UniProtKB/Swiss-Prot annotation:
GO cellular component: mitochondrial inner membrane
Disulfide bonds: none
Lineage: Eukaryota, Metazoa, Chordata, Craniata, Vertebrata
Protein name (database record): Cytochrome b
Nucleus among keywords: no
Source species: Julidochromis regani (Convict julie)
Positions contributing to heme b b562 binding: 37
Gene assigned in the entry: mt-cyb
Length: 79
């Protein structure tokens, strides 16, 4: 869905809001693509947080190198 949204989105500060309105109003099923993208991203982060919780529960934080790599990947995902 991100590729379809990127085809119509402009990141310029003056036109960003109007490009989102254009996606929702003028693109065929643009509102659906935007909602699917938002829900998919939310589901991805829920899965990531569950994975972190699983690691905490099973004591994986004791493996320092693995845990630090996971934290770096989490921060990169959030950027």
């Amino acid at each position: 869905t991100a590729l379809f949204l990127a085809m119509h989105y402009t990141s310029d500060i003056a036109t960003a809001f109007s490009s989102v309105a254009h996606i929702c109003r003028d693109v065929n099923y643009g509102w659906l693509i935007r909602n699917m993208h938002a829900n998919g991203a939310s589901f991805l982060f829920i899965c990531i947080y569950l994975h972190i919780g699983r690691g905490l529960y099973y004591g994986s934080y004791l493996y320092k190198e693995t845990w630090n790599i996971g934290v770096i990947l989490l921060l990169l995902t959030m950027m």
